[in-house]
Amino acid sequence: IDEGIAGYREETVHSAEQLTRRLGIEHHCISFTELFGDSLDTFLKGREQQACSICGILRKKGLVSGAHRIGATKLATGHNLDDEAQSVLMNVFRGDLSRLIRNSGVDSSGKFVPRIKPLSLVSEKEIAQYLILNEAWTELPECPYTRYAMRREVRSLLSGFEYRHPGTMLRLIESRQK
């Protein structure tokens, strides 16, 4: 998904194209402009504090729409252990416990595309190590809107816990599944 974040997304889209080409995997990219008529940058003017919420909703719609366009029967995302643990903790902090059990793969027309998360039990560190060992590592910029994100603080908190108490993130994910 190309959200249209100037100075950021161009580089990550290019990197994804290179990696998928190298791996022999089909790569499809769809933009917010194509889907919604404008870029995320334009949608956010004056509402930058809401960036992650707005982007998250639109990205999910875009992913489901893209999956339908190419006739996909599953939607694989790159969510890793760190992402999953952060989401669990953020939902707890927000008091949104219903999200801990909700499955969100339905678009506005009600057409379900099952999501799979093959990397959900693999840490960011392990993924980075794999990419480095296989000479596929690319240093990518961080989204400029993360400075407004609760996730940034939760990531820092969880990283500290994981360092001092190895296995924290995995146990957090396992607790959600119980």
Feature roles, as predicted:
Residues 20, 28, 98-178:
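ATP/NTP-dependent adenylation/nucleotidyl-transfer catalytic domains that generate, transfer
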